[in-house]
Every structure is written in structure tokens, then in C-alpha cells.
UniProtKB/Swiss-Prot annotation:
Pfam families named among the record's database cross-references: Hexapep, LpxD
Gene source species: Acidovorax ebreus (strain TPSY) (Diaphorobacter sp. (strain TPSY))
Protein name listed in UniProt: UDP-3-O-acylglucosamine N-acyltransferase
Catalytic residue list: H225
UniProt GO MF annotations: N-acyltransferase activity
Acyltransferase recorded as keyword: yes
Claim: Amino-acid biosynthesis is one of the keywords in the record: no
Pathways per UniProt: Bacterial outer membrane biogenesis; LPS lipid A biosynthesis
This protein's GO CC annotations: membrane
EC number from the UniProt entry: 2.3.1.191
Primary role: Catalyzes the N-acylation of UDP-3-O-acylglucosamine using 3-hydroxyacyl-ACP as the acyl donor. Is involved in the biosynthesis of lipid A, a phosphorylated glycolipid that anchors the lipopolysaccharide to the outer membrane of the cell.
Assembly with partners or alone: Homotrimer.
Length: 326
């Protein structure tokens, strides 16, 4: 498998400098381990030291790195090297026929009342239930389940073991017993969504659970019933969102972060790893917080004190200054 530098530049743009269009690229590789015949990229100037030592046939660089790249050989100069690299990987897959073939695998179970676009790919052991809709060019890899009446848009990728539309966790308590609340909603997934392996998105209790266009979900994520995730939000592995929470557009949720139910997060909110979000966030920005488990009454007192810590610090500093002045 190979591509020539001229083919890459013709397809994606960029300025090829210090090299020949017919140079053959055999592999896309990291800068530090690349060799002859490889195409690599430098997106962070901190790793410029690796550039001089790289054996890559060609390196994708920003204009600021052009001269340094030319000292070692060929380069493709673009404004956003990392984004260009992403497009190169897609071009590579298309050129070498590595994408999933359209059609339904013989071992998949698709209800006659489901609608699957002719260009969609339904992998081995998938289940698509009654009334479900799978959009054009969407790929369901092995063992994906799309539940009754759930909708998956166009150009989506669902990795192995994804479950769309299992019942949400809804129960009413009666005399010490749990009475199941039937989950009557569905799940609606927009276009260009990617969902990692073994992630679960539960159907809504009454209204639908909604995942908007361009959302990216990592492996092992739990999305509870009636959650609404805004467009182009990304969530890393082992994070979780409890029921009826609304997350805005262009947010990022780092690994193992948890968001409790019935909250609202504004657009462009960024949650750090292991953070537990317990109240709504109305302003864009980065939010971080980790607090140890304790008896609940003690935890509430300590948490309340912690929130006043900076104010207490300033009061102490003022008192100390008063003593010095006195």
C-alpha cells in the first residue's frame, strides 16, 4: 500500500517543498519512529528536536517550522498540521479500500420494519430492532445493538459492543420494592457521530435521548435516559452522564468525569478528568474538582468549608496585616 506525495497534495492541498511529487509513501508514522518511505507530522514546536533526527521521507509542518524541516528534507507546509494529518489518514483508508463494505452481514439480525440505508454497513452479530433507522454511509461494527425506534444519522461510526436504546434506569419505590417505569422514548443520534466500544446510550423515559451532530464518544461511556448532548461535544473514556442532563455544544468531558442528573452545561464547557459535576454550569470555561468520599453529613460540611477557603485565606491575610500595622 502506498501513495505518492503528489497525490496527497493534489487531494488535500498544502505546499510540497524540498521533495519530489513522485516520492512514494509506504506508511504514516510518528515523528520519533519514522523511517524512509514514511510520512510524519510535527504539530507542536516542543518536539522540534525530533524533527532533525527523523528519517521520514516527508514531514507535515506549520509555516513556522518550514525552514527547520527543509534542513532535513521534504516537507508539506500547511496552517494546521494535525488537522492535515487527520485528513491524510482518511485519504489513506479510502485509497486502499480499508473502509467497511456496504451491506448487512449474514449473521446480523435486522427487523423487517427497520430502515437501513443501502450504503450503510451492518457488521457481524449486530441487532437492529423494529422501527430503527440507520442512515447513509453509517458503519455498525460487530455486536452493535440499535434498539426499537432509535435513529442513527448519516456517516456515523459505532464501534463493537455499542448499545443504543436499552431501557433507562427508571423505577418507582413502593413499600420497599422497586416498580419498573417503562421507558417509552427512544434515542436520536445525529450525523457524523462516533461512539466507542461498549458505550451505552439509554432510551428516554418519555421524550428521547438526543446526541447531536458531530459528537464524539470514547469507549465505556454511560449516557442515561433523556440526556441531550450538543453538537461537536467530545467525551473521553469511562465518563458518565446521569438522566435528563443537557450538555451544550463544543464541550469536552475528560476521562472518568461524572455529571449528575437534571443539570445544564453551557456551550464550550470543559470538564477535567475525574471531576464530579454536581451543579449546573452557566459560563464557558475549564472546571476541575476532586473531593474524597466521606460520611455524607461530614462531606457536606467539608465541601461548604472548602468553597469558602479562598475567602477565609484573604481574611486571615488581612488580619495578619492588621497585626503588623498595629
Amino acid at each position: 500500500m502506498s501513495l505518492r506525495l503528489g497525490q496527497i497534495v493534489d487531494a488535500l492541498g498544502g505546499s510540497l517543498e524540498g521533495g519530489e511529487r513522485d516520492t512514494e509513501i509506504l506508511r504514516i508514522a510518528p515523528l520519533e519512529s519514522s523511517g524512509p518511505g514514511d510520512l510524519s507530522f510535527l504539530s507542536n514546536p516542543r518536539y522540534q528536536s525530533q524533527l532533525a533526527a527523523s528519517q521520514a521521507a516527508c514531514v507535515i509542518v506549520a509555516p513556522a517550522m518550514r525552514n527547520a524541516a527543509l534542513e532535513r528534507g521534504a516537507c508539506i507546509v500547511v496552517e494546521q498540521p494535525y488537522t492535515y494529518f487527520a485528513h491524510v489518514t482518511q485519504l489513506w483508508v479510502r485509497a486502499h479500500g480499508q473502509g467497511a463494505p456496504a451491506g448487512i452481514h449474514p449473521s446480523a439480525v435486522v427487523d423487517p420494519q427497520a430502515r437501513v440505508a443501502p450504503t450503510a454497513s451492518i457488521g457481524p452479530l449486530c441487532v437492529v430492532e423494529r422501527g430503527a433507522v440507520i442512515g447513509a454511509h453509517t458503519v455498525l461494527k460487530s455486536r452493535v445493538t440499535v434498539g426499537e425506534r432509535c435513529t442513527v444519522g448519516e456517516r456515523c461510526i459505532l464501534h463493537p459492543g455499542v448499545v443504543i436504546g436499552a431501557d433507562g434506569f427508571g423505577f418507582a419505590q413502593q413499600r420497599g420494592e422497586w416498580i419498573k417505569i417503562e421507558q417509552l422514548g427512544a434515542v436520536r443520534i445525529g450525523n457524523d457521530v462516533e461512539i466507542g466500544a461498549n458505550t451505552c446510550i439509554d432510551r428516554g423515559a418519555l421524550d428521547d435521548t438526543v446526541i447531536e451532530d458531530g459528537v464524539k464518544l470514547d469507549n465505556l461511556i454511560q449516557i442515561a435516559h433523556n440526556v441531550h448532548i450538543g453538537r461537536h461535544t467530545a467525551m473521553a473514556g469511562c465518563s458518565a452522564v446521569a438522566g435528563s442532563t443537557r450538555i451544550g455544544a463544543h464541550c469536552t468531558i475528560a476521562g472518568a468525569a461524572s455529571i449528575v442528573g437534571h443539570l445544564q452545561l453551557a456551550d464550550n464547557v470543559h470538564i477535567s478528568t475525574n471531576t464530579v459535576v454536581t451543579h449546573s454550569i452557566t459560563q464557558p470555561g475549564q472546571y476541575t474538582g476532586v473531593f474524597p468520599m466521606d460520611d455524607n453529613a461530614k462531606w457536606e460540611k467539608n465541601a461548604a468549608t472548602l468553597r469558602q477557603l479562598y475567602r477565609l485565606r484573604e481574611r486571615i491575610k488581612a488580619l495578619e496585616q492588621t497585626r503588623k500595622d498595629g
